[in-house]
Amino acid sequence: MSIFNNVKLKLSLGLGILLFGMSSIFGFQVSGENFDANFKISSWTATKNGSVITSEGIVGEGYGKVYLTHTFSSNNPEGSSGDFVGQARTINKDGEMRFASLQGIWKREGSIVNMYTLDAIDNGVMNYAKGKVDLFAGTLNFEVYPID
């Protein structure tokens, strides 16, 4: 093997490793079984340190009517990103009620807030959800991914 071929091989190998590493860093994607959860904002309250948004909607997967409360805190003066905590209550037609804790991060771009949340339900079910809040339209739309 000539020196030229050896350098070419090492360069190709290094470039391949670099591209694979970059795709791992910049290619975070969630996939798998999921369901939609759509809500209407019922109130939006300003606080000294952020906002509290309550919402409600009908969600499949046995959840039924779902009520959410999210307390948002900003990590910058522009109010363009931060974290949140929240609670959920669900009631289905059979009268089965569930409670959940919600926590995650958010980033606002104009009137749209992108949310990334991890939810723990009182029956042991855990979900990851990503969604969009349209502050002008008053809607929250999530893709929910059950965590095994």
Where are the regions a protein language model picked out?
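Beta-strand-enriched cores of mature, soluble protein domains
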Residues: 25-148
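Secondary-structure boundary elements
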Residues: 1-4, 24-26
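Bacterial N-terminal signal peptides
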Residues: 12-24
